[in-house]
């Protein structure tokens, strides 16, 4: 991994993730901004991610899945959580970016011509939602594309300690090698 500076951020990369470190974006009611740095839980530090969104990033309960996103408080059914964000790429830009790998593990289709790629950690915490395939559980969140953004909504109540799980769709599950 190599480091470089980018707009006041520290950046390190590996083959599928670009790790970006920035200052937490939380601003208190008195106008003071949190001084903590964040690399994983953008735009907030881990403390403010728990406080604002009611979730935290930690090792997934699904073998081989890497990191997952977990509730730290009760989240009712039919609640908007946050957007799935990242680089907005045309299909040709996406194809060029993943020519060697064949697919983007953090990519989601916004529309037939635009793909959101959350390969950078500053794309936000939605990138840590794992697929329910292989978990023995059912999805508890879903992706909803408005055509301008992809929103994450709960589809059943989520209790503290529950991992947020979504249906990635057949094409992605096959690309990940989870089904044939």
Task: Outline where the language-model segments fall.
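Intrinsic disorder
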Residues: 18, 28, 39, 69, ...
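Intrinsically disordered, low-complexity regions enriched in proline, serine, glycine
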Residues: 33-36, 46-47, 84, 93-94, ...
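C-terminal SET catalytic tail plus cysteine-rich post-SET Zn-binding segment of SAM-dependent SET-domain
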Residues: 2-21, 26-29, 133-180
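Cys/His-rich Zn2+-coordinating "finger/knuckle" modules used by eukaryotic regulatory proteins
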Residues: 21-51
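Acidic, Ser/Thr-rich intrinsically disordered and amphipathic helical segments
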Residues: 33, 44, 74, 80, ...
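Catalytic cores of histone-lysine modification enzymes
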Residues: 52-136, 179-180
